[in-house]
């Protein structure tokens, strides 16, 4: 057994002391899904700091709990809080929550984030289901899979032709239609942050084909796909990044926009889980 596999097993065993829940779905609560923690009929919950090998998030708007319970009548594990590279965490720490979910038996993971809108057809507060991504840090060699590979966990060269599960995207679209929610679909580009981008950088990212830009999610997606997990991910457009009409970023306004869209995304993800 590799060192990584041992770490995953140790973390899962620590969780199993408190719950024997069997769940196919794991959810990592990034921006826009914080309220979902309150929708879960919790069997048990506890701080991630009590779980071996789990780092702690420093972003104030993110929680630090692992919740085991039911959502929409379906058993789920919910990680309330995510880690970012810009906090100084190693990528292995950033993706470990997803690896723990796999060790607990989850075969699919749902993620969310906040993003800057690059597509001029998008509006502030829109929710986008991600159907592809551009991994700028990864193209520069920053990747959670760099290093020795454990073939029992996943292949050395995992395929990324369809990182976001088409079936889950269709279910999300169907749920949004029932809720009369305008659900965008598009490409997410990841940058490391924490600074926001320049006008020239926004222009370049749009020319590359990105619809939104953000600072998370992609490492977790790569780790999940390496483990054979299905992935669904959603992005809330919290500010518009039009290079020719760019205004100075207002973090308070960005957080407020995410909070306003949060009930819609919470309801959408709840319906998605219920349909699985």
Model-derived segments and their meaning:
Residues 14, 18, 167, 171-182, ...:
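Generic non-transmembrane alpha-helical segments
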Residues 1-160:
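Metabolite-binding pocket within alpha/beta catalytic cores that recognizes anionic/polar moieties
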Residues 152-164, 176, 190-192, 202, ...:
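Polyanion-binding loop/helix "lid" in catalytic or ligand-binding cores
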Residues 4, 86, 157, 161, ...:
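Glycine- and other small-residue-rich loops at beta-strand/loop junctions that grip anionic moieties
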Residues 215-253:
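Zn-dependent metallopeptidase/amidohydrolase metal-coordination segment
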Residues 241-276:
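His/Asp/Glu-rich mid-to-C-terminal helical/loop segments that flank catalytic regions of hydrolases
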Residues 164-227, 231:
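Active-site-adjacent substrate-binding region
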């Amino acid at each position: 057994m590799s060192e990584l596999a041992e770490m995953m097993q140790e973390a899962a065993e620590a969780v199993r002391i408190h719950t024997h829940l069997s769940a196919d779905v794991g959810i990592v609560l990034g921006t826009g899904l914080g309220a979902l923690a309150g929708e879960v009929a919790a069997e048990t919950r506890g701080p991630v700091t009590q779980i071996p090998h789990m780092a702690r998030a420093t972003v104030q708007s993110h929680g630090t709990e692992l919740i085991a319970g039911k959502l929409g009548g379906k058993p789920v594990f919910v990680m309330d809080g995510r880690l970012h590279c810009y906090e100084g965490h190693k990528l292995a720490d950033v993706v470990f929550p997803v690896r723990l979910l796999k060790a607990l038996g989850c075969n699919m993971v749902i993620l969310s984030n906040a993003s800057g809108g690059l597509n001029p057809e998008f509006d502030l507060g829109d929710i986008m289901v991600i159907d592809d991504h551009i991994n700028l840090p990864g193209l520069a060699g920053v990747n959670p899979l760099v290093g020795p590979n454990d073939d029992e966990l996943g292949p050395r060269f995992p395929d990324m032709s369809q990182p976001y599960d088409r079936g889950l995207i269709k279910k999300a679209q169907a749920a949004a239609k029932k809720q009369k929610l305008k659900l965008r679909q598009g490409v997410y580009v990841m940058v490391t942050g924490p600074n926001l981008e320049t006008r020239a950088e926004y222009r370049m990212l749009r020319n590359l084909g990105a619809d939104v830009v953000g600072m998370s999610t992609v490492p977790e997606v790569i780790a999940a796909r390496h483990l054979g997990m299905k992935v669904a991910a959603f992005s809330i457009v919290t500010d518009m990044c039009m290079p020719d009409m760019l205004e100075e970023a207002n973090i308070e306004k960005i957080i407020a926009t995410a909070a306003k869209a949060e009930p819609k995304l919470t309801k959408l993800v709840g319906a998605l889980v219920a349909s699985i």
